[in-house]
Amino acid sequence: MFYYPGKEQKVCDICGVKVGGQPGEYPTVLAGTIFYAGHKIVKDEDKGIFDEEAAEELIKMEEELADETGNPMMAHIMGESEEAIIRYLDWVADVTDAPIIVDSTEAEVKVAAVKHAQEVGLAERVVYNSINASVEDEEIQAIKESDCNSAIVLAFNPMDASVEGRMKILTEGEEGVSEKGMLEISDECGIENPLIDTAYTPFGSGAGTAYKVTLAVKAKLGLPVGGAPHNVPSAWDWLRDFMKKLKEEGKEEWAELAHESSDWGSNVVAATLCCDYLLFGPIENAPAIWPVVAMVDALIVEANEDVGVEPQVEEHPANIVR
């Protein structure tokens, strides 16, 4: 299994949730997305009105799975508007003590979340998603002026999707894209807990490289690394055509299994490569993801026993599920 004796591995402590370290020392942290676009529990995505009972059941489901396996959780909220993201943030903060990943397709929405978090004393629980090559000045300023010290740092290089290109955008920047590396920007923002996202792209568009760069980040930077591998099969043309064919043949269950196995499998590959955290997609998938990642974590501990790696926390899958 993978082990990095030549590079000290950073461990980020985000409100008691530890992310990083040598493979096998700490369990993989898992985050399912809630309030995503089209989420059936959301009644008004602009105002942030949602079925609170259903949402709480989903959050508590993740907490229960975390307790049962030893794999900690982070809440991952998506917001379509400033009003919505603030409402989601306040509500989730009351329901769980977990760190909260703040996410949106709009920069101003994330900025509003950070500013609000600072006002109400939640900034240290926020994980900003993300510092990337398109990060706007208002985002940088908002993070600087807050107590938010955790962020996902994206290794997406639109000019070079190779391992070298992704590492370069992190450490140096890229001509025509960013004069500074993402880690330098992260430092300037006061980020003490950088979580590298290898930028998983759809299958056929450099997805394999996103998996491979996991190893480079651990070996060369020693930083916590992960991402959203469920993006890999999300735009897989062959799978889409195959599922369509199965449905036309009346094999609906086969089609559903084909989709689910590809989605879950993308996360298992990442976990096997010793990712430190996973954004596994819709929160409803939690019961399928948690046990298999716990199994992988326990196997990694067994594989690394001969190099002296041991779990650094009592609540580790290796101490619970095997």
Swiss-Prot record:
Pathway: One-carbon metabolism; methanogenesis from CO(2); methyl-coenzyme M from 5,10-methylene-5,6,7,8-tetrahydromethanopterin: step 2/2. It is an enzyme of class 7 (translocase). The keyword Cell membrane does not apply. It catalyses: 5-methyl-5,6,7,8-tetrahydromethanopterin + coenzyme M + 2 Na(+)(in) = 5,6,7,8-tetrahydromethanopterin + methyl-coenzyme M + 2 Na(+)(out). One of its GO terms (biological process) is methylation. Its EC number is 7.2.1.4. Disulfide bonds: none annotated. Keywords: Methanogenesis, Methyltransferase, One-carbon metabolism, Transferase, Translocase. Gene3D superfamilies: Dihydropteroate synthase-like. SUPFAM superfamilies: Dihydropteroate synthetase-like (SSF51717). One of its GO terms (molecular function) is tetrahydromethanopterin S-methyltransferase activity. Pfam families: MtrH (PF02007). Part of a complex that catalyzes the formation of methyl-coenzyme M and tetrahydromethanopterin from coenzyme M and methyl-tetrahydromethanopterin. This is an energy-conserving, sodium-ion translocating step. MtrH catalyzes the transfer of the methyl group from methyl-tetrahydromethanopterin to the corrinoid prosthetic group of MtrA. Belongs to the MtrH family. The complex is composed of 8 subunits; MtrA, MtrB, MtrC, MtrD, MtrE, MtrF, MtrG and MtrH. This is Tetrahydromethanopterin S-methyltransferase subunit H. It comes from Methanopyrus kandleri (strain AV19 / DSM 6324 / JCM 9639 / NBRC 100938). The lineage of its organism: Archaea, Methanobacteriati, Methanobacteriota, Methanomada group, Methanopyri. The gene is mtrH.
